[in-house]
Amino acid sequence: MKKQWLMTLAAISAAITLYAENPSDTFICIETEKSSMILEAREGEVIFHHYGSKIGNPAQFKGLKSYRRADYGTDPQAYPATGGRYFNEAALTIEHPGSQWNTELEYISHHSYGVSDGVTRTCVFLEDPMTAVKVCLVYDAYKNEDVIICHSEITNGGKKDIILRNFYSSSLPVKAGRYLLTHFHGSWAREMQMTSEVLTNGIKTIETRKGVRTTHTENPSFILSLDTDSWNENYGEVIAGALAWSGNYRLSFQIDETDRLNILSGINPHASAYTLGKGETFVTPEMIYTYTDEGAGQASRNLHDWARNHGCYDSSITCPTLLNSWEGAYFDFDTRTITDMIDDVKDMGLEMFVLDDGWFGTEYPRNNSRQGLGDWEP
């Protein structure tokens, strides 16, 4: 009897050991054709290990010890909240009843399922047992386009209202020896000016507070070249991201004391406090990522492929084409200029000609942007 009991205990122990060593039990693997995003459920937290080249077996990350000291931080988390030992800017900051700001999210479960051909969704469920705040991290992997889209869903499971202060769509920790950030800015008549800069310790922020005028001065996108200080279209590791949001946004790039880059992307917290009632859920905008080791050009093509195949309505339809007079003529109009442009439109097979800013009067001519607007004569 004693021998049988010992054999039973040994079998149970072996089963527990196998369970613990099976990567599928603790690792959350989000994959495309050429890239992997790897998270791990460990000791109640969800640790972010990797976003980059495809990794077939995540077991290499198992038991990986933190390079941080206990007195100044924790491992990089998939969705860090204000509270506990996390000291960088948090993805989630909540003001709870009684002006209590501590939120500590614990791992509950995760599951993955196919959405459509070549598209897989992974949901990671977190909860703060003290406040009953629930967070679902959603990752949509587009296999053929090498694109992963992230957003978060925040639910108030408590009995009273809470106030969301930070509620970013995505937190992305990156580890490299050097970070070259490329982004786009501009103004009227000079949009999308490209700027590249090597990031240093501290915080670099790209944001707008102008409401729906989001891309006029700063564009909610970036290209991050790793382990280099020079731009290259054709080779090198690159992470590119674009936020699908037309309101106030912020992209935050923080290099901490361990030279890890922490990227937060989402709605700008400035003047955006949101009261979430009992049982209500707030869904953040989507953050679109792609990774490649074939340079910035391939990252751009990945995003364009995704937009054509999934992001744009009826993208397979050939759209009508028009010619707008503004860039060709500006204020310098006469009958011959207009008719010549119309004839050229016809010869090129375009469907429409638009006479832009064309209210030109005789008595009060429209010769510049400060006069004559609306004084149209047939």
Description of each model-found segment:
Residues 23-31, 35-38, 45-254, 270:
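Polysaccharide-binding surfaces and accessory modules of carbohydrate-active proteins
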Residues 34, 152, 279, 323, ...:
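Conserved, mostly hydrophobic/aromatic
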Residues 314-378:
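Aromatic-lined carbohydrate-binding/catalytic grooves of carbohydrate-active enzymes
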